[in-house]
Amino acid sequence: TLFRSAEFEFSDQDFQNIRRIINRIAGISLADGKRELVYSRLSRRLRQLGLRRFDEYCTLLETSNDTVELGEFVNALTTNLTAFFRESHHFDFLANELLPAFMRDRGLTNRRLRIWSAGCSTGEEPYSIAMVVRETLPAVGWDVKILATDLDSNVLATAQRGIYDWDRVKDLPETRRRRWFLKGCGAQAGQVRVAPALCDLISFRRLNLMEDWPMRGVFDIVFCRNVVIYFDKPTQSALFERFADRMIKQGHLFVGHSESLFKVTERFTPLGKTIYQRCL
């Protein structure tokens, strides 16, 4: 048994069961080295539910239709590491290449832009996209919508609130900070709120990428960064096929710094570091 002296009994079999369940529900592949992480993150769930052993928790996940607990289970095991303008070369490409090309190539009749931030976490990514859009495209005449989705309802709630600690924005250029964030005072001192002009562009929705996608229409640009690192290759292939089907021809896809579509899908061609264009 693993961690016998610990607060909860957690065996090899329990760990394998957890891996199987998270893979089935969310397509996430947990590595062998994640045992301690699984134990520490899920111990809180056992404590809250008044359970003594991990096998009881696995049974609960497998047999009950408690979607709330399944959500908590997924929330506990998904990692949320994000920052404003993380992997800044993506935002430079968006500002300097992609949006100017849209302005140049789209006549007066097709000034519609649809962007999807898939796995948006606590919201820094879609708000960063929105800043670039507002700074680059003319204020009038363009119909822009950003869809921001995540599996984790807790991080989505943070994203939707749009309130962040000062630390999260202190490294942004001052002009950007002043333009897009309102400083809190009183009880909100030390915090900032995202400007309404950014919030207006974004719709936040809970979405499991493994399930059906309710959205209609196609996207010009998809950000899916540091999401598929948790998925096995067949799951990645299936996901990128679905993305391609939901994008315009020549649509652009941004993936995370350690992710690659090499031998995963034929439907995108690389344009640069972790930037792809739909080709099929």
Set out the residue ranges of the language-model regions.
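Conserved AdoMet
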Residues: F3-W116, F254-G256
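A structural alpha-helix within SAM-dependent methyltransferase catalytic domains
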Residues: A95, A130-R134, A244
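A short glycine-rich, Lys/Arg-flanked "PGG" loop and its adjoining helix->strand segment in the class I
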Residues: S237-K249
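Conserved class I S-adenosyl-L-methionine
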Residues: N110-G123, K145-L147
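Class I S-adenosyl-L-methionine
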Residues: S258-L280
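Active-site catalytic pocket residues across diverse enzymes, especially alpha/beta-hydrolases
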Residues: L98, F102, V133-L137, I163
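Conserved SAM-binding loop of SAM-dependent methyltransferases across substrates and taxa
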Residues: T122-A139
